[in-house]
Amino acid sequence: NFKNKITGKCTPAKFANMANLFTSLELIKNESSDLVYFVEDDYIHTKESITEMLFTFEKLSTIFNEDVFLLPADYPYLYSKSDNTKIFLGHKKHWRLVDESLVTFLTSKKVVIENFKNLMQMATKWEDPWEKPLHEIYKKVPCFSPIPSLSMHCANINSVYGLPPNIDWKNIWDENKNYK
């Protein structure tokens, strides 16, 4: 029961997201894995997404001499600003330095533990934007988004956020429809 753990007025869907994040953060404390992938249930991934992210994590962490965040999606809304950016070569794709994301990302357990308080704030206190504590972490820990995208956030299909460009998402959907 999360009603006494989560504060602020939010929709039932946001409350469920917060409860899931809370549970995930608690589980990570006892997890032995080096890397963790927070993934919401409304993303479709390309077949190469996990492999690309794992090899790119190793490469970019080596370049920056610190662990990083990797997003599977190239969120179109991040192109609505005229900020300068930096592009790096990952395993087989280009990766763009970004300062915002939603709540699907890969990073190290170490980064999660070091930023546990800020991440737990997202799980216990509704703020708008909900991801603001995560964006604050990106000021200290580099975050990258793939070009082109490795996934699509299905909630964005009819929203101002839009679909990641240059991918045949209908084909990806068809390739994934038999996976359970």
Residue ranges and their predicted role:
Residues 109-110, 114-180:
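C-terminal catalytic/acceptor-binding lobe
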Residues 7-12, 69, 143-145:
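Conserved beta-strand scaffold positions in the cores of enzyme catalytic domains, especially
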Residues 1, 73-76, 144-151:
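Acidic carboxylate-rich catalytic motifs and surrounding loops in phosphoryl-/glycosyl-chemistry enzymes
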Residues 35, 44-118:
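Conserved catalytic core of nucleotide-sugar-dependent glycosyltransferases
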Residues 13-24, 45-49, 101, 126:
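Phosphate/oxyanion-binding active-site loops and adjacent basic polyanion-contact surfaces
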Residues 1-33:
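Active-site-proximal specificity loops/subdomain of glycosyltransferases
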